[in-house]
Amino acid sequence: VAAATVCRMNPLITAIREHEAAARFLAWPGDFDLDRGDHVEEVHLASGAALEGFAGDGAGGTYFFCGDGGEDRPVLYADSEGRAALVAIGLRELLQLLLVVPWWRDCRAFTVQQSAELEAAYTEDIPDLAVRRTRAAQALDLELPATADVMARLRQIATGAGEDYVLIFTPEGEPYEPLIKN
C-alpha cells in the first residue's frame, strides 16, 4: 500500500525513476538528479512554509518543493553560491523547463536567440540531443512547449514570486540573493 501511495502522490518522480532514458536526459544535460535532494546549508522560506529538497545538481544546487502537497507545489531552486529563485509551479512545469531549456541557468538574457546559441554548443557534444529530449518527454508523458514560452514563464515566475518565496540562510537569518533578477 505504501508504494502505491507514493506512486499516486508522486507520479512524475516515480516515472523518472522507472524510465532510464528520461532519467539520463534529466541527469545530463538537465543536471537534475533525484538522489541529490540534500542542500548544503540549513535554510527556510521567509513565509515559514514547508520546504522539501527533492533533487539537486552536480554543482551543489537543490530543488525544493514549497508548501504542503504533492508534485503540484511551487519549485524553488537554490544554488551553492547563495542565490535562489522560484523556477516552476509544479514538477511538471520544472521538467518541461529542464527538457526544453536544460541550460536555463546560463540563459540569463531569457531570449530564444541566447537559448539557440547554447543549444548549438550542447548539440556539438550531444548530437542526438533533440531525439533524446523527445524520448524523455514521451516517457514522462510531457508536452514540449516552445522555447520562447518556457523562457517567458521562467522569468515571470522567478521575478514575480514575492517575499513568501525568499530563501533564508537559517543560521544567520540572511536572505539568499535572487538568482534571476528583473
Go through each PLM region and give its residues.
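A surface-exposed partner-binding patch
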Residues: 1-82, 129-182
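Compact, glycine/acidic-enriched structural inserts
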Residues: 76-117
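Hydrophobic alpha-helical interaction segments
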Residues: 105-139
